[in-house]
Amino acid sequence: MTTSSATPDFDGRRFKQLERAGYNLIAARYAAAAELRATLHTALLDAAGLAGGQHILDLASGPGILAQAALPRVSPGGRVVASDLAEAMLAESRSQHPAILHAAADGERLPFVDGCFDRVLCGLGLMFFPNEALALAEMRRVVKSGGRIAVSVWADAPQVPLVECALACMRRLLPAPKVARLSVFRLGDPERLAGLLSATGFTEPHVETCELQSSFKAPEDYWQAFLDLAGGAAGSLSRLPAEILAKLQGGVAQELAPYLCGEGYRLTSRVLIATASRAQPV
C-alpha cells in the first residue's frame, strides 16, 4: 500500500526507521550503482547554479556521490556538507569522499543555524520525507537570503518504469504490506511541486523534466538494479523467503515486456528538477 499523503494509519516515525534500515543495508551497493543516476546529478547541479566559494548542503546525500560532484564546482574556497539519516550511507561517503564534510541529520530537523548555506541540494530524496512541507521549510531556514535550493523527485508512476515495473510486480505477486508507505511518486506533478515551494515561502519556483535512460540485458539484471536503489523496500524484501524472491525476480519480466528492445530492455524514466530561491529582504 502506498499513500499520496499522510493518512491516519501512517506512522512517520516508523517509516523513517524502515527507510534508514533499508538504506543502511544497501549502502555499498547503492554507491556502486551510481552510474544509473549520473545524468541526473549533472542536471541537478547545473540547475543549482553553483559557483566558487559557495557553501553547499546536500540532503539525503546517501553515499555522497552528488556532494562529491558538487565540490569541484564550488572550488576554490567552497565547502560541501553531505547529510543523511542512514549512518552506513555516511560511512560509505566518508570512506570514498574525505574532502567533503558529513553530518548525520533528519531533514525535517536540521542541526544547522539559520542562513548558513548558499545552496541546498536534495537529489531524489524529498519524497522520502514524511512531511515534505516541513523538510522544505528547513531547507529555506538554512539557506541564505538570495540563496537557492535544487531538488529532484520522480515524476508520475507511468513515467518512471525504472521503479514502477518492480513496484507493479510486487503489487501483483505479494499481499498488501501491513505498514502503510508513502508513494515515491507523490510529488511527481510539476504544478503541485511548484505550489509546495511557493507555499513554503520560496520565490521563483521553476520545474523542468530530465530523462534518465537505462538498459538491462535480462529481468534479473533489472531486478538487482532495483534492489540496489530501493531503500526501505530492499529491507522488507530481504526478509522474504528465497523462493518468493526468485518468483519476483523472474516475474518482473511481465512488467518489463513493453520495454523489450532487441536482446534487452530499454527504459526511459522521467525526473522533475525543481529550483526556488529565498528572497532577499527588501
Which residues does each predicted region cover?
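Class I SAM-dependent methyltransferase SAM/SAH-binding core
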Residues: 55-110, 119, 134
